[in-house]
């Protein structure tokens, strides 16, 4: 469907049917390959990929990644994903879904899904307990949790880790780079409803080490102030 060296052109927007959907860089990123599109968080690149996949295939990936079901985190009251009925996904809806808008997932779901993709491709269930210690700090019980079947291949997982490391070392997430550490991550900006309010949510998800993740963190800022709406 796409290779890292596939070429794209970003003039600052993408025309889909009768809509002009903007990139965050008004003047556009110009010529770029797919890897650079990820690093630049370029909407037209994500839109083009979504249109190549088509709504049926895209929706199937939502199912494959577990995004249409709850994570079963061990806390009550978990909210479910809000997503279009597949029958109602036209070209414009698919275009906006492809760069992370027009649907809603919880922060726990986002962290869970990314963890599952970058850990080699095995779906995990988030938990709040790893082990129990006594008053001296000695482990007296270690909880063991099952992982499920792979949602992506090991090769795909490796490629995603590599791309997200470049986001931090060279792309929109470079403010989160720390000398001596290998970090992967992704910036994100989503517009809230109603769109006429012109309000956004900025977020950054990071993990380390980039080649063998052991820790992942997610920062979310509601209605950030300033000219840059992505965060790192």
What are these model-derived regions, one by one?
Residues 1-221:
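Beta-lactam-recognizing serine transpeptidase/beta-lactamase-like catalytic domain environment
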Residues 225-226:
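Short beta-strands and strand-coil junctions in structured, solvent-facing domains, enriched
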Residues 230-231:
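Conserved small/polar residues in nucleotide/adenosyl-binding loops
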């Amino acid at each position: 469907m796409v290779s890292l060296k596939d070429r794209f052109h970003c003039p600052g927007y993408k025309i889909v049917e009768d809509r002009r959907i903007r990139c965050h860089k008004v003047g556009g990123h110009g010529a770029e390959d797919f890897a650079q599109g990820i690093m630049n968080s370029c909407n037209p690149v994500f839109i083009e990929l979504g249109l190549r996949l088509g709504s049926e295939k895209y929706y199937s990936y939502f199912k494959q990644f577990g995004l249409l079901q709850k994570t079963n985190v061990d806390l009550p009251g978990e909210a479910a994903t809000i997503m279009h009925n597949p029958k109602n996904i036209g070209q414009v809806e698919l275009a906006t879904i492809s760069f992370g808008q027009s649907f809603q997932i919880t922060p726990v779901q986002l962290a869970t899904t990314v963890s599952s993709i970058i850990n080699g491709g095995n779906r995990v269930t988030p938990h709040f307990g790893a082990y129990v210690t006594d008053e001296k700090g000695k482990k007296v019980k270690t909880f063991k949790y099952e992982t499920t079947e792979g949602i992506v291949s090991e090769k795909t997982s490796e490629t995603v880790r590599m791309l997200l490391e470049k986001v931090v070392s060279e792309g929109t997430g470079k403010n989160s780079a720390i000398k001596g550490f290998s970090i992967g991550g992704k910036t994100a900006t989503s517009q809230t409803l109603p769109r006429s309010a012109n309000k956004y949510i900025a977020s950054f998800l990071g993990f380390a080490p980039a080649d063998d993740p052991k820790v992942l963190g997610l920062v979310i800022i509601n209605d950030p102030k300033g000219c840059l709406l992505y965060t790192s």
